[in-house]
Amino acid sequence: MSTKFEYSIESVLLTSSVGKESEIKDLVVGLDFYESLSSPYIKCELSIIDAANLIESVPLLGQEKIKLHVKDLNTGNTIKRDFYIASINNYVKGNGQTAMYVLKLVTAEYMMNSLLLVSQAFTGTISDSITKLTKDYLKSTVKTSEKSNGDYKVIIPNWNPYKAIEWLTLRGISSKGYPFVFYDTLKDGLVFESYETIYAKSIFNKYVHRGGNTAKDDADQKAAMMNTALQYDIIEMSNTGKNVLRGAFGQGMHVIDHSNRTYNFITYDYDKDFKKKDRLDKFPYISDQFTVNNKKLTEYDAVHSTLYKNSLAFDTNNLNNYNNKGEFTKLESDPFMYQTGLVKITMTVKGRTDLTVGKVIDFEVERNRPVSVNTSKNSNEYLSGKYVVQNIHHKMEAGKYYIVMDVAKESLGKKVKK
């Protein structure tokens, strides 16, 4: 029985260090792409079976450019991206003239980041500064549909572009107090957006998992396969101890303004913040009935930080150096980012290149029902619901295309009751 291919390698055009072009698509037996919501670049790996002695005839020296053209046959989407060979790994000499190895690739933006330093002043919103920095230094474009709140005047002191972008992103906040992320996707390229925008997205797809881990051959209809979570595992459920130590549910900040000679102490309140911001689901993860020594968990603020306004220090966490709303950026962004991963699940689904990090999915999990429990509910109402895609591994091999992704949420679909 022949394999029905789910992707097509249209072209893998390699340009050597001296400008010689070679089409090597017939040597590629596997492609792996990695996206992360916390990474400004994607990673790519090409698995090669080389019977043409490419490694010597080109030769491969880690100074080559690759133009990649891949078609996703599950959706019809086409991917065209430029990469550079970063390294040659896992080299195994086979019989005769055959060799196997992996080409690890980096994006064109990654290469520019490695070659340039930013020494420049930027004035305006964080989103405008990142857009300009991406264009001028990474020679690329970034998709953004919103303006960050507040104006900054900053001087980047000989940093690589990615470091400058990371520094700026940490200081970005939306009009409603959501933090920003800067990331790269296989299909859409660079994106700069806030969690306010992410949470407002329509559900990209609904995935259903029924019973135990479903074998990859169980669903024989394409439509069913594209909506099936073939396998899932819970990576983390809250880890309350770690998040309490990080101040995810309560913390305080000492704000010292040298210029005005003032001192202020402000606190973060999880309960108030949860009600103020839109969330993936309706109910908070931390129960208002849970107490420690007769106090709610959210009433403790044992995690303290100090912020010096108008400080001359540049490379510090004193986020208010260049913006008078820095304390709110720090006090609201950090706890929120810790909360975004209170529930983490890794799952395997059918591959599609339009599924990227930053998308919102709906995940329905069938509940485990002991025979002693009589209920008409088929789904786990706590675990089921909306999730944000945080990490993705696109795996194309032997004609098959699967995605292994990490998804996360910070709220529950059902309130915990007695």
PLM segments and residue spans:
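Second-shell loop/turn segments in exported
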Residues: 114-123, 150-156
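Sec/Tat-exported extracytoplasmic proteins
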Residues: 137, 169-172, 365
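Short beta-strand-centered interaction patches in the first periplasmic/extracellular domains
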Residues: 100, 107-109, 144-241, 245-247
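Right-handed beta-helix
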Residues: 133, 168, 203-205, 253, ...
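An acidic/polar, Gly/Ser/Thr-rich interaction patch typically located in mid-to-C-terminal regions
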Residues: 31-59, 213-418
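Assembly/oligomerization scaffold segments
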Residues: 1-115
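Glycine-rich, acidic and aromatic/proline-enriched surface loops and short helix-turn segments
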Residues: 98, 106-112, 123-143
